[in-house]
């Protein structure tokens, strides 16, 4: 991605930093956001529950990661994504744009979004 963004080299071309998606590839979100942050044009925040691939696959809507682990969406702040550190990395890189909440969990959607908003307000304080 860095290579492509640098090759395009246009102010209108950058990185949609989706901090939760890095887990789908078994990448450390904090490290990956650190790489992506200087190129951020928008940010998504979501959270996942994580299970090692050495365990039995849980029942329900789980995603198998590239490395064979299991993740399932949950309320922002309830999972393993280091949201506060990722947000701080984005801020330090100069990102001051919008952050969209993505929710892919099994919990009630409206309740989950309200909890995510409450959590993000505390993180941003």
What role is predicted for each listed range?
Residues 1-125:
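Histidine-acidic metal/acid-base catalytic patches
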């Amino acid at each position: 991605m860095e290579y492509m963004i640098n090759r395009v080299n246009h102010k209108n071309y950058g990185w949609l930093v989706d901090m939760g998606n890095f887990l789908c590839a078994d990448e450390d979100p904090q490290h990956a956001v650190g790489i992506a942050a200087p190129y951020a044009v928008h940010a998504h925040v979501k959270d996942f529950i994580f299970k090692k691939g050495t365990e039995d696959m849980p029942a329900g809507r789980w995603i198998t990661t590239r490395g064979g682990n299991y993740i399932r969406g949950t309320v922002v702040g309830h999972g393993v994504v280091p949201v506060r550190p990722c947000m701080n990395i984005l801020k330090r890189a100069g990102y001051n744009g919008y952050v969209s909440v993505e929710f892919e969990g099994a919990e009630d959607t409206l309740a989950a979004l309200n909890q995510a908003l409450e959590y993000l307000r505390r993180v941003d304080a």
